[in-house]
């Protein structure tokens, strides 16, 4: 789809990527930390194939900052296997809020929400170690809640504290994969907010103006 950008020949240390929906289309964008647009990819929805089509046009960076959209990790393994991943910490907190709500009612939920908020206070390796300890302490205190199951009236069985379990597993998996604190070793940004608040907002404004 036109217009298109020329080939990217420079290898960048950090690249921010995100997807934005415009009507029935999805636009995937890759930019540098100074918001230089490197490439974009139109698609019907976020998928491994769509992300791979974007990544294959750009030399693999040292770090990619992303929000973990559908298909992106498989595409990264395929096209940029050696690139380090930094999950956008803003989106991590938003995902936790969706699972736990703004005001969790249980002690377990409240404590896990506090651990999520503490991500923004991790500035050193020592801070990261202490944060990981908080996560382990939470598991020792409340981990059994994530395993409890309930049989419902229709005969189906599900996790009793499903939202709590999802919030816990989000932090657990990101911690295991070392996707939370990449910035401590590589000096990259922690979020894709510059991309969302800059270029993406500009696109939304233009689309609203022309009625797209």
Model-derived regions, located:
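RNase H-like nuclease fold core
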Residues: 1-82, 167, 171-174
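Conserved beta-strand -> loop -> alpha-helix junction used to position metal-binding or nucleic-acid-contacting
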Residues: 18, 67-116
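Glycine-rich, often proline-containing surface loops adjacent to acidic residues and nearby aromatics
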Residues: 36, 92-93, 200
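Alpha-helix boundary/capping residues
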Residues: 58, 103, 206-207
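Acidic/histidine-rich catalytic cores and adjacent linkers
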Residues: 63-69, 73, 113-212
């Amino acid at each position: 789809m036109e217009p298109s950008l020329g080939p990217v020949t420079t290898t960048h240390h950090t690249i921010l990527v995100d997807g934005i929906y415009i009507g029935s289309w999805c636009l995937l964008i890759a930019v540098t930390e100074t918001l230089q647009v490197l490439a974009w990819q139109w698609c019907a929805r976020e998928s491994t194939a769509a992300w791979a089509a974007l990544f294959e046009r750009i030399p693999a960076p040292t770090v990619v900052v992303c929000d973990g959209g559908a298909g992106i990790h498989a595409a990264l393994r395929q096209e940029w296997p050696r690139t380090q991943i930094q999950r956008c910490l803003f989106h991590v907190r938003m995902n936790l809020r969706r699972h736990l709500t703004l005001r969790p009612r249980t002690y377990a939920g409240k404590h896990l929400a506090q651990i999520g908020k503490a991500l923004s206070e991790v500035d050193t390796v020592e801070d990261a170690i202490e944060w990981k300890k908080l996560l382990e302490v939470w598991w020792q205190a409340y981990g059994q809640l994530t395993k409890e199951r309930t049989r419902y009236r229709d005969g189906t069985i599900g996790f009793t504290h499903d939202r709590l379990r999802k919030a816990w597993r989000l932090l657990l998996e990101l911690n295991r994969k070392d996707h939370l604190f990449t910035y401590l070793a590589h000096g990259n940004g922690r979020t894709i907010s510059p991309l969302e608040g800059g270029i993406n907002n500009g696109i939304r404004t233009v689309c609203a103006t022309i009625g797209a």
